Amino acid sequence: MIRRPLFLGTLGFCGAILISYFLGKAAALGVLGLLVFAWWQWRQAGDPAGSNGVHAIRMQRQKLRKHGTAILMVFYVVSLVNVQLYELQRDPFAKLEETGGVMTTTATGTVLNSSIRTSGSGDEYLQMTVWVQRIGEQGVSRRWYERPVRLLVKQYPDRGTDFSDLTPVSPGTQLRITGKVELPTGRRNPNCFDYQLYLKTIGIERVMTAQTIHIKEESHSLQGWLFQQKEQYLHQLKGTAGESAAGLMRGILFGEKTEIEEDTLEEFQRNGTAHILAVSGLHIGILYGVLGKLWRGKKGWLYFWMVTIVLIGYSFLASFSPSVVRASVMIVLHLYAKVRHLRYDLGSASFVVLLMILLKNPMQLFHTGLQMSFLAVLTLSAAAPFFRKFYQGIFLSSGVVQLGLLPYTAYVFNYVSLAAVFINVPIIFLAGFLVPLGIGGFALSLILLEPTAVSGVDLVLDVAFKPVIEIMGQAIDGLCGLLTSCNSMTCIKGVTSFEVTSPPRALLAGYYLLLLLFLSEEGRLLILRKRKKAVAALICLCLAAAAIFGQVTATGFENASIVFVDVGQGDCMHIKAKDGKNYLVDGGGKIDYDLGKKTLKPYLLKNGVRRLDGAFVSHLHTDHYKGVAELCREGMVKKLFLYEGNRDKTGQICQETGMSAEDLVFLRAGQTVSLDDAGFAKSVMNDAGFAKNMSERVEVLWPEAGRDAGTVLQKRRQGFGTDNGSSAGEKKGQGSEEEDENETSLILKIHAGGLSLLATGDIDAACEDRLAAKYRNGLKTDLLKVAHHGSRYSWSEDFARYAKPQAAVFQVGKNNYGHPNGEIIENYQRMEAGIWRNDLQGAVGFSCRQGDTAAGKKRLEVVTMLP
């Protein structure tokens, strides 16, 4: 594989994209200079010495180096130019930068695809990709190299539209849409999902929330007609096969998972079989195989064009997903080679298709579906010939693909399935029946659903084919049931399926580079010829390249000892103690969203934390406690620390968190928790020497033992508190029970990584005054989590003066409470404290460098997700 010219060309093309994205244009040009220098050196090199035979071999190697470097350099330059043209795209929404990232406008355009989606809160909405032709009254012009301007439009219920309900819109429909256009959200926590980058991989730069949608012209395109037939067929399938089977077939045939039950979808993901629910090369291969069996004539040009047309039509239905495009183009290339009696090479064909895709949109290199698709086919191409010498059974292909995908799926999805190698065989076998049945049923529905012009023919067709469709629907129902049962039986959490932390990028890169080295034909030849020095040199080169890749792609949070996690309007602090121990202080939370499972759990797993040693909860309001409770239910927390006033709520807390009473630790002022032992809590009120010896610890400053506990507990409602970040209703119309809950927030002084952090929950100014009077200089801290998200009612001059933080962090998201208050920000700026905000900068991480500044302050190292 390595000797293929297209391998070197693809390597150069992808390298230019990666270097430009991670290091910038200057670094990309620097690498180009190195390539030119290497090529020039080899070009100027004289003839190597040696006997005739040795001389010929050395001449050949020198020629290969020169030509290989030239190929690498040419494709690298082409890719750099392509990336530059991509970045020169004119932005018709450039005014967004001047309006804080949001503007209201009217756009006219053509629908490219649409579907019904479900938000994290469980509400359905209509999502469309729209090709914009006009913005306001001004047309959108394009230069020859520019991409079409695409908007991702979201329309929620109860908005003024031409649609009586949420119904998918046919591609090709002309719409006039008024709404708010926004810059999509980027990655807000280290190593987590980057929504903005994902949209770029599918050619979308902006998101619009529709306020009004009006249809200008109905769709008359082929794609629109196919879309309508697809929706009608799936609606018909619900009647013959049932809603569950129809939802599964929507995923299997068209890659749309919106109607699959969440538990079923999660089982497929855990079991390593989720690829069956995303239209991929497997589906295209099955379709191609069926067409080949049905075609009885000579497989010449007529067969070539028939297959090409069918694949184009199916690609329309699958919205041209990267895996479908990859498989379809490779099949067309294979057929073309057969018709022209040319040699077909799987690896070279893969490289050709990848180059075509990246030439259109270089950002597609970061598309998960494309990465998995090409990893699978390239692993098959490189490794299957080697393993076929030892084993040729039914598990060969599945095992080889898992060899290529296992580390990647662990990195991206944080799952490892031991059953994937075996269960994929029967799953693919059943898919071999479901895909032809589904497509056959769709083809028959085209005949029945589209009326004819001949009188009586529709009735005849209905009588002839309706029973067939009924039988096919029942068969689909049975096969779908068998498919889900097989998958469910083998998906046993903790036995066949395991949650894992994401492996480091350097390890991931090293694995694939060494896999390529040892399984490629060229690498095996070096080993067989016992060229130990060459093999050792290549291994060192692979490891060095992997280390460089890991360093280049590092987020900067790897060395942070305290991270203020972005959970929106809520508090969450990640404390990294020595010996690899990890703690959270609060965990955010939203009433209608499982933030613990969908935000905190991915954050922890992707940053190397399989399970927290402990979690501290300041108080039981939703925006502090709910995320932690949800994380506990996922089995991610060993110990839970709360205020002792909550002791009589032990049963309720255990029910909400799924933890046992033995795992709850109740705290009060004067106690210290050692971060070396999460189960240890000791009163150190009169033992300052003991506390000083605990270098990494949590000191509980508030509330005092039994403070107002009886009053507070009498007033608390059952379940989660509902403060949600409001400053006790900003002191208006809020019941006193919410104020009492805030007043009894656990106030913690945390010492970790050479830094001190004062976590203040949602206390108000009166509480801060009491703390200032009691502790005075004992409040001195490096980092301050500003109380109550920066509410104007949570400012005390004395408290701030004694705390004297080097950095004040406001944990806020989008809100209607006016957080953070401008005067509070100015007050901390006046005290020369650095200001950091989750809503503007995403996650914020702090570490401490050796030595103090000239002013006696610690040297803080600060890293943020957003600039």
Predicted features, each with a name:
Residues 201-329, 335-336, 563, 756-761, ...:
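Aromatic-rich juxtamembrane segments at the membrane interface
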